[in-house]
Amino acid sequence: MALAYVPEALEPVISRETIAFHHGKHLAAYVNNLNGLLEGSGFEDATLEEIVCKAQGGILNNAGQILNHELYFGQFCAPQAGNRPSGKLAEAFARDFGSFEAFKEEFQKKGATLFGSGWVWLSGDKDGKLHITQETNAANPVQKGLKPLLTFDVWEHAYYLDYQNRRPDHLAALWQIIDWKVIEKRYA
C-alpha cells in the first residue's frame, strides 16, 4: 500500500524515520510473509477481512497486521490545529461517550493500558453505536462483527524512535494528524 502523503508530512507527530521503518519495513514484511503463505491455503482470492475472520496462525497474523496497518496509515493527514470530527460522527461521540473529549480520554487510556503489543480501536456496530476495544497482537474488530473506524498502533515499533517509552505522549499527539473526513467516511 502506497502512502497518500510524503513520509515527512506527519512530522513532528511521527517522524520520517519512523514512517520509513514502520511502513517501509514492518508492513512490507507482513505483505511478503502473507504472499509466501497464501499459495495452496484456500485464501488466495479472499479479502483481507475474510482472511482475518477465518484464518489461523501465520496467515491470520500477517493478514491482520496488513489490514490494521492499511487502516492506520490511511487515516492520517498533515498536523492540524483544532482537529475535530463533525456531522454524524460528532453526534455519535456525544451520544455514546458524552463528548468528543470524553471519548479521547477513554481511547487514550485504553491505548496506554493495553499490556504488550496491539491496537486500540474505535469501531461501529450494526446499529451505529461506537465502541472502543483493545485488540492484542494482530487482532481486528472485524473478528467481533464490528466495523473498524479509527486505530492507534501501540506496538513499540510505531512510536519508539520518536517517543521511546512514552506511549501516552505518542497517543496524545496522534489526534493532530487524524483525517476526520476519512473516519467519517468509514462511519457512514
Label for each model-derived stretch:
Residues 1-188:
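Feature for soluble, non-membrane regions of globular proteins
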